[in-house]
UniProtKB/Swiss-Prot annotation:
ATP binds at K33, G34, G35, V36, G37, K38, T39, T40, E244, N271. This is ATPase get3. GO terms for molecular function: ATP binding; ATP hydrolysis activity; guanyl-nucleotide exchange factor activity; identical protein binding; metal ion binding; protein folding chaperone; unfolded protein binding. Gene3D superfamilies: P-loop containing nucleotide triphosphate hydrolases (3.40.50.300). Its EC number is 3.6.-.-. The lineage of its organism: Eukaryota, Fungi, Dikarya, Ascomycota, Pezizomycotina.
Amino acid sequence: MSTAVVQADDLMEPSLQSIVSQDTLRWIFVGGKGGVGKTTTSCSLAIQLAKARKSVLLISTDPAHNLSDAFGQKFGKEARLVDGYTNLSAMEIDPNGSIQDLLASGEGQGDDPMAGLGVGNMMQDLAFSIPGVDEAMSFAEVLKQVKSLSYEVIVFDTAPTGHTLRFLQFPTVLEKALAKLSQLSSQFGPMLNSILGSRGGLPGGQNIDELLQKMESLRETISEVNTQFKNPDMTTFVCVCIAEFLSLYETERMIQELTSYNIDTHAIVVNQLLFPKQGSECEQCNARRKMQKKYLEQIEELYEDFNVVRMPLLVEEVRGKEKLEKFSDMLIHPYVPPQ
């Protein structure tokens, strides 16, 4: 067999068609450095998935919440249909929701004569002094909610790189918090529960045992989902970058971390590429294209077994259904620059 044929066979398709076609996928994460077009890519991928699947949910865990801006409609904590679609919904969640919000099932502590003692708050503070517990419980609560909804596939528009992979550590964080709370409960629980009475002094009138049960159920949810995250048939991670040194460096760091957690990643979307016409006299365009070409070659070399999608720098912002659909087509049908 000739070398040319081998290379043609080995060449990975420069599109996300394989992800859209893989009907076993349940979780798709889209991540990368800030400002590289993550939200545009995740919205566009969700649009393509909506053509192939019965129901798609797009979730933003980025505190900046750009989904509303991208689609030009307001989204919140509850999933709602995207205008113009019957099977694509979106929601924006705050990954740093407070423990009070998570555990409180009702208000009215002001009527409780024991609430002023602060013993419940002290227990809560001790239990949640472990870094990341707040975020872990919030994420687990979201997963619990999402699991109860019957969406075929869920696309996460994640926070910038530094925060993207925190969810992988959440089961461990929750286990630590549970161990700490169990220890406190076995030592002081019966005494505190009897002192505080049936109100328990914790948010929503829960006692310490109920708090433990709540955390245990969240830990089980997040552990179960994390097992799915490590299954390449069910989960994949799409990296988004631009052809610049820092973005490429972040992408490499992220891919190494994903690999260490056994999370599948085999697609990179390279945004904002310049394609100056032959003979163009725009010096800046040509200089930038030369730089981008260098980093593109590095990406092709480093990730030869990845689907590398090349997306052009557009003259207008990608906002609104029409422009997102146009952009989403280029994720599937590779962009051909005009000659």
